[in-house]
Amino acid sequence: MARGLKKHLKRLNAPKHWMLDKLGGAFAPKPSSGPHKSRECLPLILIIRNRLKYALTYREVISILMQRHVLVDGKVRTDKTYPAGFMDVISIPKTGENYRLLYDTKGRFRLQSVKDEDAKFKLCKVRSVQFGQKGIPYLNTYDGRTIRYPDPIIKANDTIKIDLETNKIVDFIKFDVGNVVMVTGGRNTGRVGVIKNREKHKGSFETIHVEDALGHQFATRLGNVFTIGKGNKPWVSLPKGKGIKLSIIEEQRKRDAAAQAAANA
């Protein structure tokens, strides 16, 4: 018997980085089809209800969205399960707030508050550069955009800076040794560092060696790396901790120091 697409998602099967409590019900919101993969996105309902606390219930979220109060990348979105993903800009003009979705060092989405000027652009990783009919060049980005007539210097894995009002390329960052990157997949998700080395393996994955601000080195796959700035200066504001992953002992010491400071105060 033929079966169509599943329209539901069990809460225990939802991505861990959504941080849903087990006892909050049997089901979780299933992301709609969109620019990001279902396991690598955060539906709008979770942003409004669970993260920003602007709504208490599912119905309140629908009411807010239907009043066209929420914009993603400069466009009004009324779909409650629209999949917002890495680097997306969420704007709420009514409150004058803007947020950029980034990862913390534990691989969870963080809503990083940004200024109005920073909310006007977005960084996009280039997936491929191709030629269409009549030899027209175009590039594809990680979030499903297609942009025609890009600069010929731009290649796959580079990062482009897009003006969200005009949807045109303002600037770009080459994927080169010495540029700052953020890891978007694997066990090092959310870590920020500078590319030190690039290992090419024919017939296998390319390995990228990265060094963070404290001098710790780690390696990850090429597909997990997203260039976010030239040199060691990122073009976007980073979450608390600046993408530096602490060891378990370092985290404990940090908590103890904070508790001691609070006790003394």
Swiss-Prot record:
Pfam families: 40S_S4_C, KOW, Ribosomal_S4e, RS4NT, S4. The keyword Ribonucleoprotein applies. Residues 42-104 form the S4 RNA-binding domain. SMART domains: KOW (SM00739), S4 (SM00363). The keyword Membrane does not apply. GO terms for biological process: translation. InterPro entries: KOW (IPR005824), Rib_uL2_dom2 (IPR014722), Ribosomal_eS4 (IPR000876), Ribosomal_eS4_C (IPR032277), Ribosomal_eS4_central_region (IPR013845), Ribosomal_eS4_central_sf (IPR038237), Ribosomal_eS4_KOW (IPR041982), Ribosomal_eS4_N (IPR013843). Its main location: cytoplasm. Transmembrane segments: none annotated. It is found in: Cytoplasm. One of its GO terms (molecular function) is RNA binding. Gene3D superfamilies: 2.30.30.30, 2.40.50.740, RNA-binding S4 domain. GO terms for cellular component: cytosolic small ribosomal subunit. It comes from the Eukaryota. Keywords: Cytoplasm, Ribonucleoprotein, Ribosomal protein, RNA-binding, rRNA-binding. PANTHER family: 30S/40S RIBOSOMAL PROTEIN S4, SMALL RIBOSOMAL SUBUNIT PROTEIN ES4. HAMAP family: Ribosomal_eS4 (MF_00485). Belongs to the eukaryotic ribosomal protein eS4 family. This is Small ribosomal subunit protein eS4. It comes from Oryza sativa subsp. japonica. The lineage of its organism: Eukaryota, Viridiplantae, Streptophyta, Embryophyta, Tracheophyta.
